[in-house]
UniProtKB/Swiss-Prot annotation:
Name under which the protein is recorded: GTP 3',8-cyclase
Organism encoding this protein: Pelotomaculum thermopropionicum (strain DSM 13744 / JCM 10971 / SI)
InterPro entries the UniProt entry points to: Aldolase_TIM, Elp3/MiaA/NifB-like_rSAM, MoaA, MoaA_NifB_PqqE_Fe-S-bd_CS, MoaA_twitch, MoCo_biosynth_MoaA/MoaC, rSAM
The encoding gene: moaA
Keyword Protein transport appears in the UniProt entry: no
GO molecular function: 4 iron, 4 sulfur cluster binding; cyclic pyranopterin monophosphate synthase activity; GTP 3',8'-cyclase activity; GTP binding; metal ion binding; S-adenosyl-L-methionine binding
Length: 325
């Protein structure tokens, strides 16, 4: 289905939980965030109904997010259900990777095709700092398990933060030379309580590109790996993988936006940076069927703004983990 601005909306990001086994500084504060009671989180069968309804409106791609999606019990069963829905041809997962070693094979068998793993640094001390206690070796084990399970492509999401990891961009890009990894540099976005923390830490993608090219040679435009999305991709000479840039702040890509977001509590959000949501949980629990939910999804599509307004400030009191990454 097309929205008001003739964009084809075919992608639904689903936050299956607001809980996480890490506490990354740009995603949630160290303390004070109230987790949703289990009764307020959409049940697996409710998520399945939403996906069936979304497929009726033209959604073809699903991404499961969190929080950390792998802390949600029954995730593999949800994937099996969703993968069998007519019209859904792609299921992906965004994760910190720590729980992947024991789950990657089962997720692949259930129907997950590919994964994005959050990895902001190659230094163990910095990883522990940015995640507030995470284990870098565990993340790497998860990345390797994804490769071994055949979850291709494996994309690494790296948020660039001035004063923290901008000195690692060359090393991160070098990961793509000998391995089939796709490193995506993401501009820091001011969201939730991290807005004040992010002040002064923003690094434009152009600066990262210049730093990589100066050390490793030209970045040649490359075909996009499977999955689409907003990143622009490049390849270093003879590299096995690609380097991507997501320019949410410096060069927005709203004219190409094809997505909706479903929060863990059942709110359908037309735009990450727009506070409007359509509640799907209440109708679901009042007995609404697939076609009724599809009608609400079409309402959400009609609400999609022409572009985000990040520079005007965050319009929601919730954290990124509560909305869905």
């Amino acid at each position: 289905m097309q929205d008001t601005y003739q964009r084809e909306i075919n992608y639904l990001r689903i936050s299956v939980t607001d809980r996480c086994n890490l506490r990354c500084v740009y995603c949630m504060p160290e303390e004070g965030v109230r987790s949703l009671p289990h009764g307020e989180i959409l049940r697996l069968e409710e998520i399945e109904t939403v996906v069936r309804a979304a497929a009726l409106t033209g959604v073809k791609k699903i991404r499961l997010t969190g929080g950390e999606p792998l802390v949600r019990k029954g995730l593999e069963e949800l994937v099996r259900r969703v993968s069998g829905i007519p019209g859904i041809d792609d299921i992906a997962l965004t994760t910190n990777g720590l729980l992947l070693p024991s789950r990657a094979k089962a997720l692949k068998e259930a129907g997950v095709k590919r994964v994005n793993v959050s990895l902001d640094t190659l230094r163990a001390d910095r990883y522990a700092e940015i995640t507030r206690g995470g284990n870098l070796a565990g993340a790497w084990e998860g990345i390797q398990s994804a490769l071994d399970a055949g979850l291709h492509p494996v994309k690494l999401n790296t948020v660039i933060i001035r004063g923290f990891n901008e000195d690692e961009v060359v090393a991160m890009a070098m990961l793509t030379i000998n391995r089939p990894l796709h490193v995506r540099f993401i501009e820091l976005m001011p969201i939730g309580s991290s807005s004040s923390w992010a002040a002064g830490r923003y690094v434009p993608a152009a600066e990262v590109m210049d730093a990589i090219s100066a050390k490793l040679g030209p970045l040649v435009p490359a075909r996009q790996p499977a999955g689409g999305g907003p990143a622009k991709y490049y390849r270093l000479k003879d590299a096995a993988g690609t380097v991507g840039f997501i320019t949410s702040m410096s060069e927005h890509f709203c004219h190409r936006c094809n997505r909706l977001r479903l929060t863990a509590s059942g709110g359908l959000r037309p735009c990450l940076y727009d506070g409007r949501e359509i509640d799907l949980k209440a109708p679901l629990r009042e007995g609404a069927g697939t076609r009724e939910i599809a009608a609400l999804i079409m309402e959400a599509i009609a609400l999609k703004p022409d572009r985000h307004h990040m520079l005007e400030g965050w319009r929601d009191r919730r954290q990124m983990s509560q909305i869905g990454g």
